């Protein structure tokens, strides 16, 4: 009976233990996904924004009370005819303080009232109120196969789909992997990221983020979450009456920064300030962010994490407020975006100079596929983008706090961003002289200490991987100074300096522009003293290059730019070799104390330059890319070129050879062509230097002077290759949509390309495109091709070569959901100008085969064949003798495509006057003129290796000695078949803190083991008591054998 009771007791203990473990595993499984297949899905957090009709943000020149703001608006509107207006109340924690903006509602559509407001001396700007949406969407985790539906199905959202990048991806949100480097399953393994970056070394030195105020702008945080002990304040900026996190994203971000147990954060003792700026329906407004930003300034926040972003770097109220935040010493850390591996996909505000933009890597130090790539596109078309991201860190499979406790693993740059924010918070707590900490000094320490990843260019990794301990060493001995990003220019260093290293420079070429960021750790404002100085090294042929400068007149806040144009002197037109020199700039900032009357702090920085020069290539090998006539979002609604890609409605990557046409550029370079970029009108280049002008996906209009000059250039030997795209006003009206939230129609400003403008350009040669819209797969010259939402050729000279194909009428499918097949659609035309020495013209109706954004089948082979034709006059036999060659269309009876009535292209065009009515061109702008710097030659040898870790002045890392602590590193076990990615990875325990995960798991198994052992001994004792006693037999005397010692056998 006792034995039965013992076994019953053991069974109860085992069942209780099984239930306890099952509850924990079930909770994790629920947090991971709600369906068994979720480990194979991705849940993308996408952002979109709309303009709220009738609502406007009125920004003032200073901070005023509510009464004063009301008075300013009332007096401004008094003289106008606007009567139906009101100030929208904002009930949030900042309502009791002065503000620099107001939200008003004007029900009348007259713009006179807005203009009257802007005329008021205390009003800075009036901009539309924007509504921000965040949506969670499951999709296949394989990003290679694009969304390509076989039948048209128009499913517009009720908000303007200005696509915001996925900044949070995780198991539970998304499952992500890094780059597949070999033929094996590569999973994002959840890690204790704080200890992987050796934060435990600083913990054991006594630094845990104490006395540092860190703000998390996200979805809120529950009041009694077990992971946080120092939540100083929770504020709600939404229209919902709750402070709790109903989604889990804000909890996760806060946990990565400051969790004190289980999945430990970097700075558990930091003061957490939680700003709930998104509702449970994932909606926010620009005004909510502005109020919250103002409150963050008021609360003297030290570090602010913003794990959101989007492509709209022209949302002026938001951008201006970010500048104001950093000017008030708030260190902002923001996610760079999840639109990789495509280039030119950086998100705002992470692409701003004063913000630390963070990209993502996996735990094998591969750039995460989802991480957005540079360059910035603010500067196009006339300039060149800056280096971003600033640094990269772990963003795939990172563990953080669950919404109700426990841990979960997420991936995305919105995960990498709080990793850096947490590291910065920890670093700030180590600095004794807190007055030295500012957005510039922290950024300088991070990029100077970053570890460069091999085989990765600067537009993927920035300055490299976050190195927490080296950053600590730098900050510990930091002295205020200026620095540069990048810290040197080496156009021979590949792959890091791609694309600069991909093409040497030569005489007569377009100047190479390098956009350098100046970081000023001495003060929020600064200036460049005198002018930058160019000092060529004579022994290294530095006198063979010349440089010109453009730079910020004022460095604010904490930063500015230095644009360097590099060109080759005439004497080196036939020379080949390496040329070197350096630029010297001196930055000055006002002294902080008023006692120093007019005193300034100064810092002099050297920027080494190294370039490779070759003799000027022949004209036939030089291709000029037209950048000036490409338009993008922001600010206009320029639709995608492939209408099948409804999940990416905007053309926002810049259409540059180093962004979404990167693969095409790489191919042309591999074929021996030299590609230059024209960021000015056609009147600003010497056509005798180039064999082909390449115009791809052009949305801009043309000056009359450009049309006349291009005709002369083609007559004199310049060839023209045009890749067009769809344009159809009926389809444009169809793809407009009604926003139910704003009760407003959104209309494209043009089609995929501006066909009416192109036809005006081509009319002198009797050529033109139609407004037909076609799609389909076909074969040409034994190559598989795909025509994605392209147009056809409407007319072409009779002595030209025209290739036709059979396609589906996609326009009919869009407009009427009907399917029809059209034969003999003219898509490719080749024409030789009959005049002696004339050039050649090629037309093709679709650019998607060159564009990296949604390319399904490339047509690089066709581009090669066309350039052979335009450069050397050799018509490819595969085209001239093709069975698809047809008689060129005459265009008789076809009405040319017209510009859509009421379009707003004039608002964003560099060519058209900004007014309604018939389009009229502006006056032709002057061509850019560079003022070359006067050289100050140096008769000394240049340094042989320009790549060093960016050494800040007066910093000696050897003086800052780190203690030799033995820290536990997370152990990784291999992935079993069918196992999910949400693993429990053992990690070290923070000194002085109880690891709840280990504390929950180990006692359970210890208790079960003790009970099993106890039961075993009880059973043995019971058996022994019930066994009858035996008389011990007398021991027998052993018999002697001949073999006294056993044989020796080898021990194993």
Swiss-Prot record:
Keyword Glycoprotein in annotation: yes
Regulation: Inhibited by divalent copper and zinc ions, but not by nickel or cobalt. Inhibited by its prosegment, but not smaller fragments. Inhibited by 4-(2-aminoethyl)benzenesulfonyl fluoride (AEBSF), a serine protease inhibitor.
Top-level taxon in the UniProt lineage: Eukaryota
Annotated signal sequence range: 1-17
Gene3D superfamilies: Peptidase S8/S53 domain (3.40.50.200)
GO biological process, one term: regulation of vesicle-mediated transport
Biased composition (Basic residues): 1025-1037
Cited function: Serine protease that cleaves after hydrophobic or small residues, provided that Arg or Lys is in position P4: known substrates include SREBF1/SREBP1, SREBF2/SREBP2, BDNF, GNPTAB, ATF6, ATF6B and FAM20C. Cleaves substrates after Arg-Ser-Val-Leu (SREBP2), Arg-His-Leu-Leu (ATF6), Arg-Gly-Leu-Thr (BDNF) and its own propeptide after Arg-Arg-Leu-Leu. Catalyzes the first step in the proteolytic activation of the sterol regulatory element-binding proteins (SREBPs) SREBF1/SREBP1 and SREBF2/SREBP2.
Protein name: Membrane-bound transcription factor site-1 protease
